[in-house]
A protein has these predicted regions:
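Elongated, amphipathic alpha-helical interaction scaffolds
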Residues: 1-294
């Protein structure tokens, strides 16, 4: 019989616990399962989301790490809807590339980047909970894949473009409804339901069973964590209610005005609950001026 342990949510752990080198194994496990190869994190790099703030209800949480091969891995957790999320993914990867090459260095110093995005909102249409994107150059007339010459260790070698270009992983947590039987499914079960099997051997999760137990937190940490969970529950309730109202209005009117009013309804509800302008802008995509007029 399984012990019903309570585990700390991943977004909280990423922001406050997994940056500790003693806990790298949890994050390494997730990346290992996704990439299909053993990954060792050498160090964490500065990232925009590693600052702790009191008002982080809608903040993204991210970690930027370097592995033993010198590659850069970005792990981002996003709790709420972003209108231009793909553009932000691209910007984050581009910034990581340019930050880690000096002016005047040869292009062979450009680092491979992996962008892992864990989303708790509806990004769009799609039936899977895991999507993988990589760059492939396909012949327009021959349909073959281009292989390029590169110089490594003073030798010319053949490489596929996707060995050089960034790779993207999108994990749509809310779309996971499977029974967890594979390592990636066990990870999704934890990300969505905070559940970890007692007998798990999945990389990262066997370490998480020991390191991410709710009962190991101090009283102060528990109070902060419980408040965070309450914020998420209220936020989800407000957003779901407002989205339902927007859908109903859209169906009734059959016009774009209905969808626009739904967004306005979300903004009004969030504003009445005391959320800041910046947070409301992130959720709804409205401008500061539009929100101020509500």
């Amino acid at each position: 019989m399984e012990v019903n342990n309570k585990y700390i949510r991943f977004d909280w752990a990423v922001k406050r616990m997994l940056r500790d080198k003693a806990n790298f194994a949890v994050l390494e496990g997730l990346i290992t399962v996704l990439l299909g190869e053993t990954v060792t994190i050498v160090e964490l790099l500065e990232s925009e989301g590693n600052q702790e703030t009191s008002n982080d209800k809608f903040n993204r949480v991210d970690i930027k790490a370097k592995n033993s091969k010198g590659e850069i891995i970005i792990v981002e957790v996003q709790l709420t809807r972003q209108l231009y999320f793909l553009q932000r993914m691209l910007y984050g990867v581009s910034k990581a590339i340019t930050e880690h090459i000096e002016i005047g260095q040869l292009y062979d110093k450009v680092k491979k980047v992996y962008s892992i995005n864990i989303l708790y909102f509806d990004l769009g249409k799609g039936t899977d909970y895991l999507y993988h994107g990589k760059t492939v150059f396909t012949g327009v007339h021959t349909n073959d894949q281009l292989v390029v010459n590169t110089k490594e260790d003073e030798e010319l070698r053949m490489r596929l473009p996707h060995d050089i270009f960034p790779e993207y992983y999108i994990i749509r947590v809310n779309e996971f409804n499977n029974v967890a039987t594979t390592p990636i499914e066990e990870w999704l079960d934890y990300l969505k339901n905070n559940h970890i099997k007692d007998d798990t051997s999945t990389p990262g999760l066997k370490e998480a069973r020991k390191k991410l137990l709710y009962m190991t937190m101090t009283d102060k940490e528990r109070r902060a964590y419980d408040a965070h969970m309450d914020d998420i529950m209220v936020q989800n309730d407000v957003l779901e209610t407002a989205k339902s109202e927007g859908r109903a209005e859209g169906r009734a009117e059959g016009r774009a005005e209905g969808r626009a009013e739904g967004i306005m309804s979300i903004a009004k509800n969030l504003k009445s609950m005391g959320y800041g302008i910046v947070d409301i802008m992130k959720v709804t995509g409205l401008s500061e001026e539009e929100i101020m007029k509500l």
